[in-house]
Amino acid sequence: MRRGERRDAGGPRPESPVPAGRASLEEPPDGPSAGQATGPGEGRRSTESEVYDDGTNTFFWRAHTLTVLFILTCTLGYVTLLEETPQDTAYNTKRGIVASILVFLCFGVTQAKDGPFSRPHPAYWRFWLCVSVVYELFLIFILFQTVQDGRQFLKYVDPKLGVPLPERDYGGNCLIYDPDNETDPFHNIWDKLDGFVPAHFLGWYLKTLMIRDWWMCMIISVMFEFLEYSLEHQLPNFSECWWDHWIMDVLVCNGLGIYCGMKTLEWLSLKTYKWQGLWNIPTYKGKMKRIAFQFTPYSWVRFEWKPASSLRRWLAVCGIILVFLLAELNTFYLKFVLWMPPEHYLVLLRLVFFVNVGGVAMREIYDFMDDPKPHKKLGPQAWLVAAITATELLIVVKYDPHTLTLSLPFYISQCWTLGSVLALTWTVWRFFLRDITLRYKETRWQKWQNKDDQGSTVGNGDQHPLGLDEDLLGPGVAEGEGAPTPN
C-alpha cells in the first residue's frame, strides 16, 4: 500500500494478498486503488509499526463535500437576502475578509490532499494546512507595507496594538541566595517561577514528539541558549541569569520536557495498533476507550535521522535545526518589531499554530529524506512551514534593520567563527577527505589482493616455482600436479 494511505470500508481487496482484518501501515483513511495493498511485512520500513484494522468506514470518516457545500450556500444566501448590510465601511471590510477566509477553509478542509496523519480526523490536519496558507498570505501582506502602516494595520485586529512597548528590566540581580533580603533570600528563584516555566516544559515535550530524537532536541535546546547569550545586546529580554539559562531552562524545563517526550515516544513505539469500529465493540468501557484512543496516532514511525550516514542527510538535519532555531528567534523578534506584548493572544495563537503544523512538517521531511525515489516532492506542510519561517525573518529584517545590524561583541563573534570552522572542517573530513582516504586504502587493498591471486595462480600451474618441494605440496599433490615423485 502506498505510504500515507489506509484501507477503505471494503476491507482487503480481492487482488490484494492482505489477510482479513489487516490495514495499511500508514495513517490517512483514504482507500487505495485495487492492487495497491500490501501485507504488514510488505512495503513497510523497519521503523514502522504494524497496524490491525477491521476496515470500518463510518459516517465520521466520509468527506461530506456536498453537505459542507449546502451549508455554506445556505449561510451565504441568508447573509445576502435576509440580513441588512451595515453602513460601516470598516466593519464590512473586516466581515468580508473573514468570510473569504472561511470559504477558503471550507474548500480546503473538504478538497485538500490528506497528509500523513489521520487522528483525530484527516479534516483536522487539512484545516491546519489551509490555515498555513492564510497565515503566509497575511505575512506577505505585512511584508509589503511600510513599517508604520504595518504596525498600525494590526489595530484592525486588536485596537490595543500599534503602540510602542514599554521598556522592562531584564537580568537584574542574579544571586541564587540573596543575604540582603532577610525575609526571603531565595526571592530571585521564586520570581522566575512564572507561567513560562510550564510553557517551556510543555513546548519541549511537544517538540520532542515532533523531532523524535534525543540528540537533535538537546542540540537545539543548548544552541538556543547560546543564541540568547549572543543576541542579548539586540533584545533585552534575552538577558537572563546564568542559572536561568542552564539550570531553569536547559536542565529543568527543557530537559524534563525532552525526557517525558522520549518516554512517550518509547510507549508509542511499543504500543499495539489494533483498531475496531466503535459499533463493533460490545462493552461501554471498550467504546469509551476507543473514543479516547481516537486522539492517539493511527500508527507510528520511529525517526532514524542518521545525519552522519551521507552528506545529503547531514545537510538536511542541519537545515532542520536551523529552521527550528529561526522559528524560535522569530517569536521574540516579531513581538519586538511589531510591538506585541508577550502576553497577547496573537503570540499564543502563533505558538498553537506551530504546534499543530510542526509535527506534520517533520513527518513530511522525514519521508522526503527516507524515500529512495530521487524526484520525490517535499510535502506541502513542510514547504509552507519553511516559507513562513523565511517570511517572518524578512519582516524582522525590513521592520528593524538597525537592531539586527548591531555588531556582535568580539568574543561572541570569535566563538561563532570557531564553531563554524569546526563544523565545516568536520563536514569536509567526514564526507570528502575520509571517503577519499577509504577509497584509496580500498584500491590499494584490491591491488595487493590481485597481485597475491596472480602469484597463487602461477604457483599452482603446470610447473612449480623453484624451491617448491614435496614437503610443502605432499606426495599426492605432487603426483597430481605432474611433479617428479621421489624414488
From Swiss-Prot:
Keywords: Endoplasmic reticulum, Glycoprotein, Lipid biosynthesis, Lipid metabolism, Membrane, Phospholipid biosynthesis, Phospholipid metabolism, Phosphoprotein, Transferase, Transmembrane, Transmembrane helix. One of its GO terms (molecular function) is L-serine-phosphatidylethanolamine phosphatidyltransferase activity. Pfam families: PSS (PF03034). Residues 1-10 have a biased composition (Basic and acidic residues). Residues 1-50, 451-487 are annotated as: Disordered. It is a multi-pass membrane protein. Coiled coil: none annotated. Requires calcium ions. Inhibited by exogenous phosphatidylserine. Pathway: Phospholipid metabolism; phosphatidylserine biosynthesis. The modification Phosphothreonine is found at residue 485. One of its GO terms (cellular component) is endoplasmic reticulum membrane. The chain crosses the membrane at residues 63-83, 97-117, 127-147, 314-334, 336-356, 377-397, 404-424. Residues 1-62, 118-126, 335, 398-403 are cytoplasmic. It catalyses: a 1,2-diacyl-sn-glycero-3-phosphoethanolamine + L-serine = a 1,2-diacyl-sn-glycero-3-phospho-L-serine + ethanolamine; 1-hexadecanoyl-2-(9Z-octadecenoyl)-sn-glycero-3-phosphoethanolamine + L-serine = 1-hexadecanoyl-2-(9Z-octadecenoyl)-sn-glycero-3-phospho-L-serine + ethanolamine; 1-hexadecanoyl-2-(4Z,7Z,10Z,13Z,16Z,19Z-docosahexaenoyl)-sn-glycero-3-phosphoethanolamine + L-serine = 1-hexadecanoyl-2-(4Z,7Z,10Z,13Z,16Z,19Z-docosahexaenoyl)-sn-glycero-3-phosphoserine + ethanolamine; 1-octadecanoyl-2-(5Z,8Z,11Z,14Z)-eicosatetraenoyl-sn-glycero-3-phosphoethanolamine + L-serine = 1-octadecanoyl-2-(5Z,8Z,11Z,14Z)-eicosatetraenoyl-sn-glycero-3-phosphoserine + ethanolamine. It is found in: Endoplasmic reticulum membrane. Optimum pH is around 7.5. GO terms for biological process: phosphatidylserine biosynthetic process. Glycans are attached at residue 181. Catalyzes a base-exchange reaction in which the polar head group of phosphatidylethanolamine (PE) or phosphatidylcholine (PC) is replaced by L-serine. Catalyzes the conversion of phosphatatidylethanolamine and does not act on phosphatidylcholine. Can utilize both phosphatidylethanolamine (PE) plasmalogen and diacyl PE as substrate and the latter is six times better utilized, indicating the importance of an ester linkage at the sn-1 position. Belongs to the phosphatidyl serine synthase family. This is Phosphatidylserine synthase 2. It comes from Homo sapiens.
